[in-house]
């Protein structure tokens, strides 16, 4: 690992941090250390990093803004790539835009609304990066990323990079081909939007933001929705029906605002969150015979 670190420092690929606590890089403020955390300065740097990682046959993981993510207490072995400011480029060409995987979803939605471009209003208030949003087909208010994506540039596990069309992404509810069939990371994406009245777009976005503020605990350290909705049921409603709102294990607490959110109430460990997730799953299965599957990504070395 020392040789790899020195090579990456010499190649000037961006910021290279050793034994970096990932709690500093997740919205839940939980997570053990990464052996090496690298914040690449651009897409070319990502390619260089991957060449060195493959040469050293080192494990690698990619994160974005750390939302929708639970990093385990022992952290992550090998290299963690954090896609941030180095991959937050944006090009607007009429109704088609190209945006980096590290670009903030909220920032993009706001920027496009000011230009009268409609299609991303549903994302107002969604934390996280474009890369993560495409990876999991993020959505809200009856729409999702699959409705507007044209294609995405993907870094695959073997280090190769290629463009995948919307059809090739094989989108479904909160999933894409990148999660299991062809594991990969979104470096940039192309979206097709529509011109519309700016005032109308801004009003719709504000309504969506207000709804989130009123119903979801984004002022507390959390990872967004913990469970996928077991349609036609809704995860949050099932948790509330089971009278679990406010239930706490260690430092992890089911939000008093929304049953599908677990907040870090202070000093929570990943194990606290896992224990609470398993408790909820068991309770809902016993009471309603419904399987609850996690939406939050759980990564890292297990205890």
From Swiss-Prot:
Residues of the active site: 174, 225 (proton donor), 295
Residue span(s) of domain FAD-binding PCMH-type: 30-196
Reaction(s) catalysed (UniProt annotation): UDP-N-acetyl-alpha-D-muramate + NADP(+) = UDP-N-acetyl-3-O-(1-carboxyvinyl)-alpha-D-glucosamine + NADPH + H(+)
InterPro entries for the chain: FAD-bd_PCMH, FAD-bd_PCMH-like_sf, FAD-bd_PCMH_sub1, FAD-bd_PCMH_sub2, MurB, MurB_C, MurB_C_sf, Oxid_FAD_bind_N
Molecular function, one GO term: FAD binding
Coiled coil spans: none
Keyword Ribonucleoprotein recorded: no
GO biological process: cell division; cell wall organization; peptidoglycan biosynthetic process; regulation of cell shape
Listed EC numbers: 1.3.1.98
Keywords on record: Cell cycle, Cell division, Cell shape, Cell wall biogenesis/degradation, Cytoplasm, FAD, Flavoprotein, NADP, Oxidoreductase, Peptidoglycan synthesis
GO CC annotation: cytosol
Cofactor(s) the protein requires to work: FAD
Job of this protein: Cell wall formation.
Protein name stated in the entry: UDP-N-acetylenolpyruvoylglucosamine reductase
Species name: Bacillus pumilus (strain SAFR-032)
């Amino acid at each position: 690992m020392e040789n790899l670190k020195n090579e990456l420092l010499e190649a000037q690929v961006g910021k290279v941090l050793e034994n970096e606590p990932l709690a500093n890089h997740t919205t839940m403020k939980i997570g053990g250390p990464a052996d090496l955390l690298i914040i690449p300065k651009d897409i070319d740097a990502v390619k260089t990093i991957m060449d060195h990682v493959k040469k050293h046959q080192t494990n690698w993981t990619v994160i974005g803004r750390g939302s929708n993510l639970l990093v385990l207490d022992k952290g992550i072995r090998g290299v963690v790539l954090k896609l941030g400011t180095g991959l937050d480029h944006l090009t607007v060409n009429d109704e088609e835009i190209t945006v980096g995987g590290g670009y903030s979803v909220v920032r993009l939605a706001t920027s496009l609304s000011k230009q009268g471009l409609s299609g991303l209003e549903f994302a107002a208030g969604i934390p996280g990066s474009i890369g993560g949003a495409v990876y999991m087909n993020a959505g809200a208010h009856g729409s999702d990323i699959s409705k507007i994506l044209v294609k995405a540039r993907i870094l695959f596990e073997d280090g190769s990079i290629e463009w995948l069309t919307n059809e090739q992404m094989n989108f479904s509810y909160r999933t894409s081909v990148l999660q299991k069939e062809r594991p990969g990371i979104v470096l940039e994406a192309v979206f097709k939007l529509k011109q519309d009245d700016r005032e109308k777009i801004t009003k719709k976005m504000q309504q969506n933001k207000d709804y989130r503020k009123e119903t979801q605990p984004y002022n507390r350290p959390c990872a967004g929705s913990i469970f996928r909705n077991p349609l036609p049921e809704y995860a949050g409603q099932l948790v509330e029906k089971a009278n679990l709102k406010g239930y706490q294990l260690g430092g992890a607490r089911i939000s008093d605002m929304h049953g599908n959110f677990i907040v870090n109430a202070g000093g929570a460990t990943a194990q606290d969150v896992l224990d609470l997730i398993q408790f909820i799953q068991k309770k809902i299965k016993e009471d309603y015979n419904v399987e609850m599957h996690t939406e939050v990504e759980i990564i890292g070395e297990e205890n």
